[in-house]
């Protein structure tokens, strides 16, 4: 009887470990990317909360006229 309980405990630990590995591999987070070019601003994989929206709203595409070289 003790061997059966020991075997059940090992199986339970293995099943829980496999479930944990699968669930963590399914939850992949991509980094937030804000790409600013001369023509546009692209937002990729970003969580759009109020703070992020306010920050993005003030961005403008890069232009040579606004750049200053000293």
From Swiss-Prot:
**InterPro entries found in the cross-reference section:** TGBp3
Name the Gene Ontology biological process terms: transport of virus in host, cell to cell
The answer to whether the entry has keyword Zinc is: no
User: Which regions of this chain are Cytoplasmic-facing, per the record's topological domains?
Assistant: 28-70
Cite the ranges annotated as topological domain Lumenal. 1-6
| Keyword Transport found | yes
For this record, the Gene Ontology CC terms, alphabetical, are: host cell endoplasmic reticulum membrane; membrane
| Cellular localization per UniProt | Host endoplasmic reticulum membrane
**Which residue windows are transmembrane per the record?**
7-27
Q: Name one Pfam family in it.
A: TGBp3
Sorted UniProt keywords: Host endoplasmic reticulum, Host membrane, Membrane, Transmembrane, Transmembrane helix, Transport, Viral movement protein
Main localization (coarse): host cell
General function of this protein: Plays a role in viral cell-to-cell propagation, by facilitating genome transport to neighboring plant cells through plasmosdesmata. May induce the formation of granular vesicles derived from the Endoplasmic reticulum, which align on actin filaments.
**Family of the protein in this entry:** Belongs to the Tymovirales TGBp3 protein family.
More info: TGBp1, TGBp2 and TGBp3 seem to act together for cell-to-cell propagation. TGBp1 is the main movement protein that physically cross the plasmodesma with the viral genome. TGBp2 and TGBp3 would facilitate TGBp1 function.
This one is known as Movement protein TGBp3
Q: Which organism is it from?
A: Potato virus X (PVX)
């Amino acid at each position: 009887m003790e061997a059966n309980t020991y075997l059940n405990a090992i199986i339970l630990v293995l099943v829980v470990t496999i479930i944990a590995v699968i669930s963590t591999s399914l939850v992949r987070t991509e980094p937030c990317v804000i790409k600013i070019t001369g023509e546009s601003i692209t937002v990729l994989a970003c969580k759009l909360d109020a703070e992020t929206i306010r920050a993005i709203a003030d961005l403008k595409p890069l232009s040579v006229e606004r750049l200053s070289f000293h």
